[in-house]
């Protein structure tokens, strides 16, 4: 049986590969073990053969080195594969992000183009209207006396607004303008001609700036739209080594948006000034006794607009108050739930601590830091952390409830102030202004 096994095994190599032997230091260690030589000449020194323990140690060293090399190689292959996947995903993600950013940029440019186009139309239309008013102003009649009492009474009534509602809004500005017209109608008529001419020039300058900005954005839109269509299969893409460098004259997204915003703001400011000037011209083009009809109409519009703003703000405040009250109720329930949760954590903590306490009386070597002991300590820590988290959240919720109560009182105060302002503007001022005189003299064509 043993001979068959030996025959079936592969033959041992018949020769030893020729390799250079490592140079060993000429150190001879004493061999006092049972395998020492029996010759007298070598007594006290080991033979040239290795011990069996040394042979085993050498094999173990070789095995460990082979395992270490394989493990290091496998780790390197895994890291290489992971790096390839990460770089590919990063490249795709970066390109997708850039394409998305280009799309968002196109939306931004389109938005500002639309705003510029709208403002260009509005400024152009307003300029034409102002030119017509200037022609009427050149042949206007002297103004007449205006109902001074109504204007001053409106101002006095609106001074009784409370809190933050005591604001100098468009209505108040128009009323002050009306009073000033009564006192300075003759002088105002002479100054308005020059003012109208100046406003027309400013409107045209603002419109020119808007048109230049619109032209630049239209060109930029074409470039970004072209860039957004590029992909890895595009045939007209190539390397541009210096393309990633920033130009010295580039703008930031903030300054880019701010530039257009300022242009639109300036145009709107000039347009609003032009609207106000036309309203003023309408007033001074009237007969002296009835000159304020146009101003009356403008004030009526502003009053109505202001009342709508107040009512809209009041409705929104009432909506926020309703939601705040609902949130107060929800927060109160949340606080109750947190308190209950804190109370519910007491029994588990008592159980865990009691278990630890009882197990501390185990005798002698039985007082072992076993898995149960470690898990009980961990459980106490977890429950303590839960206690702390719940208490912290309870404090935050109680502070939130106090903040909600403060907000509720502030909302109720604002609602009352706005209701008072609506009463003053609609019931007091607008009702009083229904007594304003009307007639053909107010048309300003005589």
Curated annotation (Swiss-Prot):
Q: Name one GO cellular component term.
A: sperm flagellum
Q: Which UniProt keywords apply?
A: Cell projection, Cilium, Cilium biogenesis/degradation, Coiled coil, Cytoplasm, Cytoskeleton, Flagellum
What does the entry give for GO biological process?
A: cilium assembly; cilium movement involved in cell motility
Per the record's keyword annotation, is ATP-binding included, yes or no? no
Query: Which Pfam families does the UniProt record give?
Result: Tektin (PF03148)
This protein's superkingdom? Eukaryota
Q: Where in the cell is it found?
A: Cytoplasm, Cytoskeleton, Cilium axoneme; Cell projection, Cilium, Flagellum
Q: What is its main location?
A: cytoplasm
The record lists its disulfide bonds as none
Coiled-coil annotated spans = 182-215, 297-346, 378-422
**What does the UniProt record say this protein does?**
Microtubule inner protein (MIP) part of the dynein-decorated doublet microtubules (DMTs) in cilia and flagellar axoneme. Forms filamentous polymers in the walls of ciliary and flagellar microtubules. Contributes to normal sperm motility.
The entry's family comment says: Belongs to the tektin family.
What PANTHER family does UniProt report for this protein, alphabetically? TEKTIN (PTHR19960), TEKTIN-4 (PTHR19960:SF12)
Put simply, this protein is called Tektin-4
In its UniProt entry, the species of origin is given as Xenopus laevis
